[in-house]
Amino acid sequence: MRSSTHIFVSFVVYCGVFVTSAIALSNHTNAYQCDRWSNVLNELQANLFHEGQCRSAALRASGTFGGGGADGSIIQFAHTELAYPANEGLEEMVYTLKHFADGHEVSYGDMIQFAGAVALSNCPGSPRLRFYAGRPEAIAPSPPNLLPLPTDPVEKILSRMADAGFNAGDTVALLAAHSIAVQNTIDPSIPDSPLDSTPRIFDTQFYLETLLRGTRYPGKGRGPAQSKSPIEHEFRLASDAAIARHTSTACEWQSFIDNQEGLRSAFRNAMVKLANQGHDNLVDCSFVIPVPPPWNLPVEYPSGKSRSDVEQSCSDVPFPTISLNSDVHD
């Protein structure tokens, strides 16, 4: 399957950003409505996620802020939304999810959110996301040009996210999806390039490494969507580098370094807000989502890197003490 900047979880993150209205979630569980998702789970794990692998080609999606709506409009109106530049590379994932949704007679919006929660559950260290079912099908495509790109300045990114009800802290937390991400389309010369050194683990290594001084481009590309990376074979998005160093977000970014529980909680809360915007009276089927494998190892400097390589942009609090290690886990 063709892959791009984000794994599937990022696809879900950005599919939900610009659908806003009041949220009224049900606290009850409907056995009939939830039980069908056990069958969906089994098929996704076997046929999409390769028996529960975290890093799989089937998990990857596109661009930094691509996507349609949490109502599944990107699937319902694929012919329209897949033409948007921000959705480059999503074609195969969109049509794959359409196949599964049609086969199980569930809505496209529900399928996007469920598959994202299941995908994340396969990654050690990730939070267990809640899943609410009952989204109706979309009745119109998402408008174009709603979501920012990796080439956009931080102010524009934060402004767009604020329009959707997400503050700067939410934005930084949602970027945790990049801890289990790879790119293919920004620089096709280096397919499957990870955005940190632990792409199979949902951890805070991404937040540390994005603050390390960039020294090289990993491939042949020198486009405006990427910045120099600190490690061979590691890719860095220009927007990630900018958000990590911006005065509005630098301290929030730094706060997640070696703070696994803090990141898990912040990401989970932001995803609940994102996944359920624009819908009411959804049914709680969270019990169907598997419990992710644990991961509690501390963050480490990659081989050859140390505190002197950090470009600290938050002056309010000291930088956390990080151990040196020549073998970062993958």
UniProtKB/Swiss-Prot annotation:
Glycosylation sites recorded in the entry for this protein: N27
Q: Which InterPro entries match?
A: Ccp1-like (IPR044831), Haem_peroxidase (IPR002016), Haem_peroxidase_sf (IPR010255), Ligninase (IPR001621), Ligninase_C (IPR024589), Peroxidases_heam-ligand_BS (IPR019793)
UniProt-listed Gene3D superfamilies: 1.10.520.10, Peroxidase, domain 2
Presence of the UniProt keyword Manganese in the record = no
One GO cellular component from the entry? extracellular region
What processes does the entry annotate via GO biological process terms?
cellular response to oxidative stress; hydrogen peroxide catabolic process; response to reactive oxygen species
Instruction: Identify the residues that bind heme b.
Output: H178
GO molecular function term, any single one: metal ion binding
Signal peptide per UniProt: 1-24
The record lists Ca(2+) 1 as bound by G69, D71, S73
Q: List the disulfide bonds.
A: C34-C285, C54-C123, C251-C314
Which EC number(s) does the record attach to this protein? 1.11.1.7
Q: How is the cofactor bound?
A: Binds 2 calcium ions per subunit.
- Which compartments does it reside in? Secreted
Name what cofactor the protein needs.
Ca(2+); heme b
Record keywords: Calcium, Disulfide bond, Glycoprotein, Heme, Hydrogen peroxide, Iron, Metal-binding, Oxidoreductase, Peroxidase, Secreted, Signal
Give the record's family classification.
Belongs to the peroxidase family. Ligninase subfamily.
Q: What else is known?
A: In comparison to other ligninolytic peroxidases, lacks a Mn(2+)-oxidation site (as in manganese peroxidases (MnP) and versatile peroxidase (VP)) and an exposed tryptophan responsible for high redox-potential substrate oxidation (as in lignin peroxidase (LiP) and VP).
Known role = Can oxidize the lignin redox mediator veratryl alcohol to veratryl aldehyde. May be involved in oxidation of lignocellulose substrates.
Q: What's the protein name?
A: Low-redox potential peroxidase
The source organism is Taiwanofungus camphoratus (Poroid brown-rot fungus)
